[in-house]
UniProtKB/Swiss-Prot annotation:
HAMAP family: ATP_synth_C_arch. This is A-type ATP synthase subunit C. It is a peripheral membrane protein. GO terms for biological process: proton motive force-driven plasma membrane ATP synthesis. Purified ATP synthase is 25.9 nm long. The hydrophilic A1 domain is 9.4 X 11.5 nm, the central stalk is 8.0 X 3.9 nm and the membrane-bound A0 domain is 6.4 X 10.6 nm; the domains are connected by two stalks. ATP is synthesized or hydrolyzed by the A1 domain while ion translocation occurs via the A0 domain. Keywords: ATP synthesis, Cell membrane, Hydrogen ion transport, Ion transport, Membrane, Transport. Pfam families: vATP-synt_AC39. One of its GO terms (molecular function) is proton-transporting ATP synthase activity, rotational mechanism. InterPro entries: ATPase_csu/dsu_sf (IPR036079), ATPase_V0-cplx_csu (IPR014272), ATPase_V0-cplx_csu/dsu (IPR002843), V-ATPase_V0D/AC39_subunit (IPR050873), V-type_ATPase_csu/dsu (IPR035067), V-type_ATPase_csu/dsu_dom_3 (IPR044911). Optimum pH is 6.0 for ATP hydrolysis.
Amino acid sequence: MAMDIETLLDLEKLYSAIMTYFDNPLTLLIVVATIIIVLIVIVWITKMVIDLAPYAYVNARIRSKEAKLFDDAKLNELIESGSLEELVGLLEDTDYGQYVIEVMNELKDPVAVEKALDMYLADLYGLIYRISPDSAKKVLKVFAKKFDIKNIKTLIRAKFVGLSAEETYALLIPLGNIPVEKLKELAEVKTVEEVVRGLDGTEYFKILQEELSNYDQTSNIIGFELALDKYYLESLRKTIMTEGKEEDIFREFVGTIIDVENLKVILKGKADGLSAEELSKYVTLTGYELADWKLKDLMSAGGIEGVLSGLEGTSYAEVLAEAMEEYEKTKSIYAFEKALDKFVLEKGKKLSTRKPFGVGPIIGLIVSKELEVKNLKAIIKGKIENLKPEEIRSLLISL
């Protein structure tokens, strides 16, 4: 039916014309509903594309990094290497090559090697941060605080054992939020107390100052380290307490990390005979799966067996129960720490597939690389200490 412009402008005639085609009102209703549904789908797809587009480039870069992760064959090759020099040769064509080669003359020093690998991680974090969209940067920036924390711990340990300024600075990683000039200045001081005072004006000063009286009484620096770990986890938790789908993924990941680190503190505390009151100073409440009341129950539990019993019904019960046999043989908390680190790895991998075109791959790469570096440190340390291949394998977190 041909319609001229005047007819189109006449709403009544337009209605009549439409009804000529759709003499059944139900047919018209179906057509209108279909149009609305199509529009909703178009809007949803458009929004999804807009949300995911910023991750296209970063995820392409991350996939290329993931492709270079060590498989079991590569790890076995490193473990079976005949010497440190041979091991470094095997690493030469990997992402770690340039970092390890720089400390070839210090290969017998596990601290120098550890610093080289930490430098790799720091550079990786820097790369991911630079290429990530703003929705991910706020959490990645807090993750990068771990290098500040590591430097502060190193400064405190160095001054506790009386290292010189030169020896101290050689151990630091010149990355993070603390300026390099400030790190040099802190390396020059003589005592632990001076390190704390030198951090006045930074976000870390208050928590360290609160631990000074405990240090004065016990001459034990573990309180500083636990307080810093707690502060780091609380910073992560505060950052991800926002709305949004990307933050939901980060929230689950960070919450799991908080659960795991809390369990490490509690298990170590039980092994060392700490009271619930002492433990509560260093446990970060509100993780992902472990509620505040559950953490308080675990801190009050009787020994390690009591902690494991108190975890019944959680995702961590089976993980730690499987590690109990190794703990009973070795009497080392490392058996539990290794099992919990593996749990975090598996969680990261699951989350990376849940949001494969968004923030998921970022989480997957971070957790995979951190545990790969832990394994590398264990292999190199094992070679330095002349451990047998099977002994080195027992230290690794399976990937």
